């Protein structure tokens, strides 16, 4: 999990320009990290590329926190 979280954190920091300390498993992309819907779509696309997974629109709609993203990747990559 640590390696996945580390990579996800780097992508979020690079994409959203937030401090690494704000990226926690409980952090909401929209509420805590300031992402808008376009940011979330771009994050999902970058996660797909980085981890070699395909995230369906339905699944992407349920990825609201950093922890959701990490869990999805661990279960599907």
UniProtKB/Swiss-Prot annotation:
Compartmental location: Cytoplasm
Domain of life, per lineage: Bacteria
PTM per Swiss-Prot/TrEMBL: 4'-phosphopantetheine is transferred from CoA to a specific serine of apo-ACP by AcpS. This modification is essential for activity because fatty acids are bound in thioester linkage to the sulfhydryl of the prosthetic group.
GO BP, sorted A to Z: lipid A biosynthetic process
Domain Carrier span(s) in chain numbering: 2-77
Pfam families named among the record's database cross-references: PP-binding
GO cellular component: cytosol; membrane
Family as reported in the entry's similarity comment: Belongs to the acyl carrier protein (ACP) family.
Reported function: Carrier of the growing fatty acid chain in fatty acid biosynthesis.
Full protein name: Acyl carrier protein
Organism for this UniProt entry: Listeria welshimeri serovar 6b (strain ATCC 35897 / DSM 20650 / CCUG 15529 / CIP 8149 / NCTC 11857 / SLCC 5334 / V8)
Gene that this polypeptide is encoded by: acpP
């Amino acid at each position: 999990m640590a390696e996945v979280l580390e990579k996800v954190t780097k992508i979020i920091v690079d994409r959203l320009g937030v401090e690494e300390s704000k990226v926690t498993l409980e952090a909401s992309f929209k509420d805590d990290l300031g992402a808008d819907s376009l940011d979330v779509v771009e994050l999902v696309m970058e996660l797909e590329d980085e981890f070699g997974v395909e995230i369906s629109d339905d699944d992407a709609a349920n990825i609201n926190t950093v922890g959701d993203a990490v869990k999805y990747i661990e279960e599907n990559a």
